[in-house]
Amino acid sequence: MELEELGIREECGVFGCIASGEWPTQLDVPHVITLGLVGLQHRGQESAGIVTSDGSSVPTFKSHKGMGLVNHVFTEDNLKKLYVSNLGIGHTRYATTGKCELENCQPFVVETLHGKIAVAHNGELVNAARLRKKLLRHGIGLSTSSDSEMITQLLAYTPPQEQDDTPDWVARIKNLMKEAPTAYSLLIMHRDVIYAVRDPYGNRPLCIGRLIPVSDINDKEKKTSETEGWVVSSESCSFLSIGARYYREVLPGEIVEISRHNVQTLDIISRSEGNPVAFCIFEYVYFARPDSMFEDQMVYTVRYRCGQQLAIEAPVDADLVSTVPESATPAALAYAGKCGLPYVEVLCKNRYVGRTFIQPNMRLRQLGVAKKFGVLSDNFKGKRIVLVDDSIVRGNTISPIIKLLKESGAKEVHIRVASPPIKYPCFMGINIPTKEELIANKPEFDHLAEYLGANSVVYLSVEGLVSSVQEGIKFKKQKEKKHDIMIQENGNGLECFEKSGHCTACLTGKYPVELEW
């Protein structure tokens, strides 16, 4: 909850769709993409955009972008502008680099030597400053402050070995990966295909789904359904609402070509010798929707295991367990079950107080939490509460909640946090306050319970979080071939023979790559 209130947020979500079969298609591609972006709304609420194409040899790109939520940006009239399309990509954005302005809305479209490309990007380049200087030195102008535009221009820039008459997009993407090791998941649309790309460290998520007939959606045993199209998304949670089945993840370093005919791996780029995969562990903790799948496990299940581990590490004598609505609910339920305590709601959330609620005067500022939460005091008067939260960032939000509960009759309030203390900024696509703003780096952290007004405060350990995440991952036997990940076809797509790894830089200060300034 506190992550949401205090500006720790995912940068964006990407979504693409391509129709199978005969073109022009009967599939309503713009609506499919819009619904996909609605499913990714939690990943970005500042702006949204869609670019579609007819997929011809000289394609017509149609674009609509705007500030605000997906449903506000894409009205029926706006969607009509995107019709007669067979494929397209979309984007919903939060800003980590680049201002919150219309010019920074994605997808970006540029003209290249071989026609237009459209690019949607989730992540943040760790060496953006150096790449910006390099592009400017080569005479390539940049019209925005977004590092995503730099990716687009790097892709448009012809590699020295490429012949003028034959675009080699794999070479261009590999050149990008050489220039920028992390962090990005990309959708690149050119003519009649979409390229889905994940950086070699796999820091940002990306997965593929298969559009099937509506009549077959609920028949999970039917494996030979007609394929009406392919979709690719930051998270699998967006698939169900559009009638798609989860197919597989895009692997770290993988370049996938998605066409009207099939999905095929063009290449998999390895990391520097000895460097592990570094998937962002906070996708599990907070950013992803609980019904999404990463590494063959549901996010909700991981959060539940975190709650169980928290109960093992930090039990306390109490009467009930509750949560600050609502991202920590799985962890709170698990904590309660493990400790043999009842789970009871103590707060109800006012869902119509938005994230950007304006507090125009001191009285409203002082009311603070009371505007956002109602108190279910009959559930906890005279009782000892264990309140489970997903994080404590600055401490500005949880402290008023503790005060509110105690003033409403709670005998004790014990805080249990289902993730470790955040001590370091992220430079790979997550907007985290400066190191000095984080409560874990302040003198008050040594007596945090007293500072917050709680009876006790305990975080989940880093080891506990990592074990909770990795417990459910079905490791395959690792095989190597020239340092690349070996893949093979199976019934559900591709099978990866590599042990997973996770980035914990915001918790430990150990970044997967050397940072450049």
Swiss-Prot record:
Database matches in InterPro entries: GATase_2_dom (IPR017932), Ntn_hydrolases_N (IPR029055), PRibTrfase_dom (IPR000836), PRTase-like (IPR029057), PurF (IPR005854), PurF_N (IPR035584)
Sequence ranges assigned to domain Glutamine amidotransferase type-2 in this UniProt record: 12-261
GO terms of molecular function: 4 iron, 4 sulfur cluster binding; amidophosphoribosyltransferase activity; metal ion binding
Propeptide part(s) removed at maturation, as residue ranges: 1-11
Disulphide bond pairs: none
Cofactor: Mg(2+); [4Fe-4S] cluster
GO terms for biological process, alphabetical: 'de novo' AMP biosynthetic process; 'de novo' IMP biosynthetic process; 'de novo' XMP biosynthetic process; GMP biosynthetic process; purine nucleobase biosynthetic process; purine nucleotide biosynthetic process
SUPFAM superfamilies: N-terminal nucleophile aminohydrolases (Ntn hydrolases), PRTase-like
EC top class, as a word: transferase
Domain of life of the native organism: Eukaryota
Key word Iron-sulfur present: yes
Catalytic activity: 5-phospho-beta-D-ribosylamine + L-glutamate + diphosphate = 5-phospho-alpha-D-ribose 1-diphosphate + L-glutamine + H2O
Gene3D superfamilies: 3.40.50.2020, Glutamine Phosphoribosylpyrophosphate, subunit 1, domain 1
Active site, renumbered: 12
This enzyme's EC code(s): 2.4.2.14
N-acetylmethionine sites (modified residues): 1
Subunit structure: Homotetramer.
Protein family (similarity comment): In the C-terminal section; belongs to the purine/pyrimidine phosphoribosyltransferase family.
Protein name: Amidophosphoribosyltransferase
